[in-house]
Design a protein with these regions (language model features):
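Sec-dependent N-terminal signal peptides
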Residues: 3-13
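Generic cytosolic/nucleocytoplasmic N-terminal low-complexity/intrinsically disordered segments
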Residues: 1-2, 39
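Carbohydrate-active catalytic/glycan-binding domains of CAZyme proteins
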Residues: 16-338
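Basic side chains
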Residues: 2-3, 316
């Protein structure tokens, strides 16, 4: 009897540690990029709003108009702090609409917010806004990053250099480009062709420009062949994130129309990366988008789902849960319906 009780107690405690929790109830946020700055956890999410745009084609109903910054003093804190609006669409000279998933990097005490938005011609570009504080407010540069396109910037610091990763299919417009040049018409590769890749570029010293032409990131299967466009369970769709663990580089992303978070492992920021498996099975809602961060020697997955809005794809809520590796360094798959 004592044994059973001890087992139940232990399993309850361990379940409580693993279970995800929602981070914010009052407003809808999504696509959280989490970072530890000055010993605090900062979250840079998209700010979802209900919208008059009813047609979901190409993500038009993700019609966000501003960014907020959220923070936690520690991971267990019950109420996430909202620092309020830190950048508005109307204060970005070049942007017309759709402030999608952002990320932030710190360099020499300044904070750089990277964000996608559609310009006046309806093309997604990536902009930068700068602040002296992690919680903003941020001031946008007058123009987007020269040569930028598509969505979902994620900035990664490695050996003193900063790299920007980006790209997203369909609504994210990656099919409109080849070799960094716009096509006359968007063209999807056919199923047997190589899948479109996320992009990477070194950032300039001042963090405001690409210091090189964006390059393709190769994601390979177990035989060393690039993943094919028809491989919807494994190929890149959007929402790339990169982190290191035991000196290896983990590139994680959403598979979009199959709604999974998956990852691939490489040995430097440019790759190639070899596909490994699923991090998170589909959540409630069409999109899945995440970040992975080490906090106090433990690893966490920040993500979103649409359960609290009753499954409305464009009204998403932030979540966090512990992420675990097995003894070989593979990420243990988590259930998106938890
Ligand atoms: O939030 C708008 C878009 O939905 C993001 O940019 C994508 O990653 C997807 O989550």
């Amino acid at each position: 009897m004592k044994k059973i009780f001890t087992f139940l107690l232990f399993s309850q405690i361990s379940y409580a540690q693993e279970a995800p929790r929602y981070l914010f109830d009052d407003l809808y946020f999504a696509d959280p990029s989490a970072h530890v700055f000055n010993n605090k956890i900062y979250l840079y999410p998209s700010h979802d709003i209900d919208t008059e745009v009813k047609d979901p084609t190409n993500g038009g109903h993700y019609n966000m108009k501003d960014y907020h910054v959220l923070s936690l003093d520690h991971i267990g804190q019950k109420k996430t702090k909202d620092h309020g609006t830190v950048l508005k669409l109307e204060d970005i000279p070049w942007a017309e609409k759709q402030l999608w998933a952002p990320d932030v990097a710190e360099k020499n005490g300044k904070f750089y917010l990277y964000f996608p938005a559609k310009d006046k011609e309806g093309n997604f570009k990536i902009g930068v806004a700068v602040s002296n504080k992690p919680e903003g407010p941020f001031t946008a540069e007058k123009k987007p990053i020269k040569g930028s396109y598509s969505i979902d910037p994620a900035v990664f610091k490695d050996n003193g250099k900063y790299y920007i990763y980006f790209g997203g299919l369909k609504g994210g417009q990656l099919e409109k480009y080849r070799d960094n040049e716009p096509l006359a018409q968007a063209k999807e590769p056919n199923d047997q062709e190589n899948a479109l890749s996320p992009k990477i570029a070194l950032l300039s010293q001042n963090m405001l420009e690409f210091a090189e032409k964006p390059r393709d990131i190769q994601i390979l299967d177990e035989k060393g062949n690039p993943l094919k466009a028809g491989d919807h369970d494994r190929r890149f769709f959007e929402g790339v994130w990169i982190h290191t663990y035991n000196k290896k580089y983990y590139l994680s992303y959403s598979t979009g129309d199959t709604h999974k978070l998956v990852y691939a492992i490489g040995y430097n920021p440019y790759g190639p990366f070899t596909y490994q498996g699923e991090i998170l099975t589909p959540v409630t809602g069409w999109t899945t988008h995440h970040s992975i961060v080490e906090i106090d020697h433990k690893w966490y997955l920040f993500y979103h789902d649409s359960k609290p809005s009753g499954g409305k794809n464009h009204l998403r809520s932030l979540k966090v849960r512990k992420l675990e590796y097995d003894e070989k360094g593979f990420i243990k798959t988590m259930n998106g319906q938890d």
